[in-house]
Amino acid sequence: MNTTKTKKQTTAMARVVLLGLLMLLPMTVGAQRVLTLDSCRAMALRNNKQIGVAKTKQEINANLRKSARTKYLPQVNALGGYTWTSKEISILNDEQKSILGNLGVDVGGALQNSLAPLVSLLPAPAQAKVAQDLTHLTGLIDQTGQKMKNAFRTDTRNMFAGGVVVTQPVYMGGAITAANKIADINEDIAQNSFDAQRQNTLYHIDQAYWQVVSLRYKQKLAESFLDLMKKLNSDVQRLIEEGVATKGDGLSISVKENDAEIALTKVSDGLALARMLLCQLCGLPIDETITLADEVSEDIAVQEITVQPDVQQAVANRPELKLLQNTVDLTQQTTKELKALNLPQVMLTGGYAVTNPNTFNGFEKKFGGFWNLGVLVRVPVWNWNDTKYKVRASQGATTIANLELADAREKIELQVNQSSFRVNEANKKLAMAKANIAHAEENLRTANIGFREGFVSTTTVMEAHTTWLSAQSQLIDAEIDVKLSQVELQKALGTLE
């Protein structure tokens, strides 16, 4: 019964311990950040400042393209203004104003002179009646003249004007079409710049990632070699005590051990710097502790590929070539835009205008308006060949852009062939490094056996260890070189994604 009770207690305790371990497991995993190549790439793309700039340029050029499209549409503008002048516009001169102002006096005097002989024949009461009528008529004519004088007054010292104007381009010599194509090309340039920056970011993050992996494996190798040297030094010291080995052998081993410690320090420092660079590219704090998935595996996973140079694929995919082609297209459209300056331009205009004072019913001190519709034609006549010279300069820029495009194609063709050659060369080096590893390990095993048996010298054992270390280091370099050569080929072909 006690035995059964003890078993139950033991089982319960085991469950508690297991539960505690399971609870601690997430904390342990969370403390150690393991990054894969894909996760490093994703973080680098998210945090790269230049990619952010490229994205913003895409948005800018998309808005500029939309702006260019509006040039096909009618433009509506509202205008308004006020003007004060110290003098008003006068339709009549001073003499004419004086004549109208004294019109009654002049006419009355003329009538009185003309009718005087006849009036003198009338009786006195009749003469008085005629004189009274002439005076009244003179006053009426004076009033009429004054009204005519005032009617011709413009009163333009305070002028108001306003209106709404609509303009619709009909033919602009192809300038609007060229401007829209330029906007489309600029949008393509922004996209191709983004693709180029993205590929450069991936290329650099891959290099930094595999550099860390390479140095980590070399650090493990240096630690292993240092352990071997320490063990060998211990064995030699024991043999010296037994009188089998000399002090010179012991000193040689000590020097090798010190060299191994120095090598380990160098590779550890290099690894720390490489991790800092990788963290910076990923947007992480440079002092953050990270572990890469490929550095904790037994071996570096290498997949060899056989490639044939495909220049056409590179020409179709490389964003650098697309950017140069964009430059060619841009200069061609700029030439068309300049040529449009020498062609006639036709626009429809229309709108509604108001003025105060207005002249639609004489001069009235109030707002009056009217509708209008018209055609505006602009025909260049002579500009001293200014446009002609600009067109020639733009055509020269097109020639330069075509030459740069052809030169870039030749260089990319060479780059693709070099990258393909490097991939094949890296595969061969990897095969030779693997073969050297087998020979070096067998040589080391034989040397160790001979040393233990006493018929192999310390120098021979150290040479075997050094050869083994060199072979292991060459294998790491060969494996990493295969990885980097494949990345370089993808970048050369424009397929790095």
What kind of feature is each model-predicted range?
Residues V53-A68, Q197, Y203-K220, K231, ...:
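Amphipathic alpha-helical coiled-coil segments
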Residues G80-V164, E295-E304, K336, T349-V379:
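Small/polar, glycine/serine/threonine/aspartate-rich low-complexity segments that form flexible
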Residues G52, V76-S90, K147-R157, T167-A196, ...:
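Small/polar (Gly/Ser/Thr/Ala-rich) solvent-exposed segments
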Residues M1-D38, L45, E497:
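Bacterial Sec-dependent N-terminal signal peptides
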Residues T3-Q9, N63-R65, N192-Q313, R422, ...:
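Periplasmic alpha-helical coiled-coil/stalk elements that build and connect Gram-negative outer-membrane
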Residues M159-A161, Q207, S252, Q345, ...:
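Transmembrane beta-barrel architecture of outer-membrane proteins
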Residues G30-S90, I286, L292-D329, R409, ...:
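Bacterial Sec-pathway N-terminal export signals of envelope proteins
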